[in-house]
A protein has these predicted regions:
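Transmembrane alpha-helical segments and their short flanking loops
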Residues: 1-14, 31, 37-54, 94-106, ...
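C-terminal ends of transmembrane helices
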Residues: 4, 71-83, 126-140, 189-200, ...
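Membrane-embedded helical hairpins/re-entrant loop segments and their flanking transmembrane helices
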Residues: 13, 39-74, 283-356
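Hydrophobic, membrane-embedded alpha-helices of multi-pass small-molecule transporters
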Residues: 14-31, 176-187, 205, 250-298, ...
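Early transmembrane hairpin of solute transport permeases
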Residues: 16-184, 371-374, 381, 385, ...
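Flexible hinge motifs at transmembrane-helix junctions and intramembrane kinks/re-entrant loops
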Residues: 55-56, 175-176, 189-262, 285-297, ...
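Alpha-helical transmembrane segments of multipass membrane proteins
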Residues: 72-77, 100, 126-131, 139, ...
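Hydrophobic alpha-helical transmembrane segments in multi-pass integral membrane proteins
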Residues: 101-105, 159-167, 221-229, 330-331, ...
Length: 463
């Protein structure tokens, strides 16, 4: 596709900050919600009696954001600044993180388990990277041709459709779903108009304009609802913002110091034993292989967008090392292993901005913003419906990117037709495989099925 900014291009400083801010908004909501979900899982385990210790020091979303920024910088370093994608908290490891806390003798030991588990996952990436370094990547192309990768990329976006629509329809307690949908659709419409009809600057920052427009409309409804006492019109929950000065205006109103994972982990490292380490390996290593499959799909997707094969230059071994080590760094600070974000890839595609300088700046901003209380509070106050509208475009574009790859496949050949069909139905249908606490996600299951079907049907018929 035609890019406005290529990988090595460096926009002017003012533009760079705005573009980076847009990348940050695209990945921030998902990155912040992973530690929140994990906190909820741990508290649920405590309520059920499965966990008996207190969970006073919960995981910090701000620390996860900082970890994502640091992880992205590590990734950029390993990939020689040739791959324009941001790393964020991985949803694939949610079960693994819950298992790390569930098997620990204390919350502090659980935090140590998060780091050890991420190290196991990162080690899987390092081992695969070493194999790729010596064996090359041609086997990847043979194992995962376009008829396999194309529909897999498509289902990465399509499998998130329910999340986007669910968020679009989400209203606060007492709020009306139709009002929420209206606000989300305003954000989506403005984003599309800016991207298609906007002048150069508007074309490059459609998501910022769309989110702010949706937020403004939501704020108008909320103000009217508060003034008239009509709960149905209340869309925005301003409590994250008002909480900043609930105890008076202090330094914490403006700046905060996130509670890093390694700080709590150091207190619990003495409580770690061999059995617990073994359980961590069982919880994290299989998931790492699943995420490896998604890693390839993401990089095939971004390669098609920038029209450069990232698996060959800088090389799959470098992208794996960057992802693996970046994931470990993210876990040390935020507790969450990182992964390449499809939202970031979609943002690059829609805006035509593949500048790695933008990604680096976004990573630096993520690190700095993690300490700025008002900004984190503002992001937390953005209504789910607004982000749902934006995600309809982001996730949709991921799906379309995969379908564009399928366009190049000869679907008149029944072999290709069956491969694509199996992947799409298994992925969209949500075919996940569970082995105890280990889950192979629907995307990974669909990819594995596609590979197997392609191999079986590729066998030459005997004369």
């Amino acid at each position: 596709m035609k890019l406005v900014y290529n990988i090595k291009d460096k926009p002017k400083f003012g533009q760079l900050i705005v573009f980076a801010f847009q990348q940050l908004l695209a990945i921030m909501a998902a990155t912040l919600v992973v530690p929140v979900i994990t906190n909820g899982n741990v508290l649920a385990a405590i309520e059920s009696g499965a966990v008996t210790w207190e969970f006073t020091a919960q995981m910090s979303p701000a620390a996860a954001l900082l970890g994502a920024g640091l992880g992205t910088l590590v990734y950029i370093l390993f990939t020689k600044a040739k791959s324009p994608v941001f790393l964020g908290s991985s949803f694939a490891f949610l079960g693994s993180m819950a298992a790390a806390f569930a098997g620990a003798v204390s919350a502090q030991a659980g935090y140590a388990g998060l780091i050890i588990g991420a190290a196991f996952a990162g080690l899987v990436y390092v081992v695969i990277a070493a194999i790729v370094k010596f064996a090359g990547v041609n086997w990847i192309d043979k194992l995962m041709p376009k008829q396999v990768i194309g529909p897999t990329v498509a289902i990465i976006g399509l499998s998130l459709a329910g999340n986007a629509v669910g968020d679009l329809q989400k209203a606060p307690a007492g709020g009306h779903t139709l009002i929420a949908v209206l606000c989300g659709l305003v954000a989506l419409l403005v984003t599309m108009l800016c991207s298609v009809f906007g002048k150069k600057t508007a074309k490059l920052i459609p998501f910022i304009i769309g989110i702010l427009s949706g937020y403004a409309v939501s704020a108008v409804f909320t103000v009217i609802g508060n003034a008239a006492g009509i709960d149905a019109l209340k869309v925005i929950d301003f409590s994250p913002i008002t909480a900043l000065w609930a105890d008076g205006v202090t330094i914490n109103t403006f700046f905060q110091f996130p509670e890093f994972t390694f700080v709590n982990a150091l207190k619990g490292i003495k409580e770690i034993d061999g059995a617990y380490i073994g359980s961590l390996a069982m919880a994290y290593v299989p998931v790492a292989f699943v995420v490896f499959a998604e890693h390839i799909a993401d990089h095939k997707n971004i390669s098609s967008i920038i029209e450069k094969d990232l698996l060959k230059e800088p090389g799959l071994h470098r992208t794996l090392l960057g992802d693996g080590v970046g994931s470990m760094v993210g876990a040390v600070f935020g507790g969450c292993p990182n992964t390449t974000y499809g939202e970031s890839v979609a943002c690059v595609a829609i805006t035509g901005n593949a500048s790695v300088a933008t990604i680096i700046t976004a990573a630096v901003l993520a690190i700095l913003i993690a300490f700025v209380s008002p900004f984190v509070a503002f992001v937390n106050s953005i209504p789910s419906c607004v982000m749902g509208g934006i995600c309809m475009a982001l996730y949709g574009f991921i799906a379309v990117s995969g379908l564009k790859m399928v366009q190049k496949v000869n679907l008149e050949d029944n072999r290709n037709l069956f491969v694509v069909s199996v992947i799409l139905i298994a992925g969209i249908g949500g075919l996940a495989l569970n082995f105890g606490k280990i889950q192979i996600t629907s995307i990974a299951t669909a990819l594995i099925l596609g590979i197997l079907v392609n191999i079986i049907l590729s066998k030459k018929k005997k004369a």
